[in-house]
UniProtKB/Swiss-Prot annotation:
Family the UniProt entry places it in: Belongs to the actin family.
Compartments, as annotated in UniProt: Cytoplasm, Cytoskeleton
Protein encoded by which gene: ACTIA
Top EC group: hydrolase
Pfam family, one: Actin
The protein's name: Actin-1/2
EC numbers: 3.6.4.-
GO MF annotation terms: ATP binding; hydrolase activity
SMART domains linked: ACTIN
Species of provenance: Podocoryna carnea (Hydrozoan)
Keywords: ATP-binding, Cytoplasm, Cytoskeleton, Hydrolase, Nucleotide-binding
Other comments on record: There are at least six actin genes in Podocoryne carnea.
Superkingdom as given in the UniProt entry: Eukaryota
Main location: cytoplasm
Function, as annotated: Actins are highly conserved proteins that are involved in various types of cell motility and are ubiquitously expressed in all eukaryotic cells.
Amino acid sequence: MADDDVAALVVDNGSGMCKAGFAGDDAPRAVFPSIVGRPRHQGVMVGMGQKDSYVGDEAQSKRGILTLKYPIEHGIVTNWDDMEKIWHHTFYNELRVAPEEHPVLLTEAPLNPKANREKMTQIMFETFNSPAMYVAIQAVLSLYASGRTTGIVLDSGDGVSHTVPIYEGYALPHAIIRLDLAGRDLTDYMMKILTERGYSFTTTAEREIVRDIKEKLAYVALDFEQEMQTAASSSSLEKSYELPDGQVITIGNERFRDPEALFQPAFLGMESAGIHETTYNSIMKCDVDIRKDLYANTVLSGGTTMFPGIADRMQKEISSLAPPTMKIKIIAPPERKYSVWIGGSILASLSTFQQMWISKQEYDESGPSIVHRKCF
């Protein structure tokens, strides 16, 4: 199938960030926001080379005059035209490759609608003329990256979180739980609680500022009630943040109230279990004989697991749910923001994987539905 001298491309299209690079590399070459921006004002200066749309970092840097849209929501592509722009940008501007010369590995969230991966497959073969492609489940790749074959992965990105138990390399589909609560919801919640403090953030561009505040200052409290008392009685937890216009805002309990929603989704008006309960429920759906191995190999992955304090809090919460003698280990690799991509890089460069690719020929014979037969 693929010649050995042609490196496969690995593209992890997240709801928030797109990570792209070459199989065999230890980190993605390109990481940029999964954003397409369109001007919201009339261009008046001729010869400025104004475009009708901007992608990624360029959209981010011109955000003040653009309306920003994320074509991927909750891990599902909602706007295929914009998605095509992002892929085009990935291949031609970021990686500078001809997509028709390289096999491409894409990633997706589990329990996604079937039509989503069929359309991905169709665009890769028909628009970009890929010689071969494959769609892998994000959490499975994170486990590859951690060097394990057994464990439960809590993968939480910008659009979707999911827990996937894997035993000896087999994913257990009946025990996968998907939670549509992730980083973007926390950004929205942060916008809301900052409004209560008298700071107003409304536009799509201002949301990006709030996302930055969240990423730089938020953390997970080990004991939420205790932390709330500390915040109320002293200013030790307050931090200041400088907005792009030089104005300085101060945030206090918002720093840990925001990610607390991961453990208490009721904060967002969501009627679902928190990430700790979801992980526990996922383990409980597995056979009693393998639970011990899952408790001892709970792997965190994705950008929304980057909050300081999250691993200790997970350890505490799961310990109180699990049987008292159970050994619980939360693994939080420092590079977990990119572990899905890293796992993809490992997978696509394995010699045993080379017969797994869907080739252009197979696609021409069977159509887009081949993706369900050949990809887990």
